[in-house]
């Protein structure tokens, strides 16, 4: 019996490469790995560092979550949280983002719908009643609210932007992007199709202090 050592060593040499490549299949840029099925997967994430009023080049106004990698113009759903954070009767140091924010991308990866879950740790009955007024469901120790109707568009960072007008967060928080995939496979990540428009930032005039992930400071 004649052994094919040449073929054996060739296969052995390819084995480590196969192992290395298998580790790269996480999250984004994996195609055709889910043929015959559909679902939702995490494509990537970003860290939100600040908030500002803004409008894009089309005149669409809203609030912008300023990220380390991208900017996110919130066109719907942010008014309630801004009003709440501007209320001096609420102790903003007791506001906490319960989990990472979740943004689900649309098919074109230019728009998203988002969810942010908040905790508010009340100190007295007056704070508890006020939190209830803002839509929180209150228990013995804290109140909870899920902001499920955030809508917006994703924008590239503008190198000429004056980011001094951004109100920086005490504690930046993470947002995770999710995409739906079909039997055709998992699509590219969010960076493949961003809106080529400029977001113009402006100062939030009210004395807004947005504290998230309060537990980090414990």
UniProtKB/Swiss-Prot annotation:
Q: Which UniProt keywords apply?
A: Membrane, Transmembrane, Transmembrane helix
Q: Where are the transmembrane segments?
A: 11-31
Q: How does it sit in the membrane?
A: Single-pass membrane protein
Q: Which compartments is it annotated to reside in?
A: Membrane
CC terms in the record's Gene Ontology section? membrane
Name of the molecule in the record: Uncharacterized protein YidX
Q: Which gene encodes it?
A: yidX
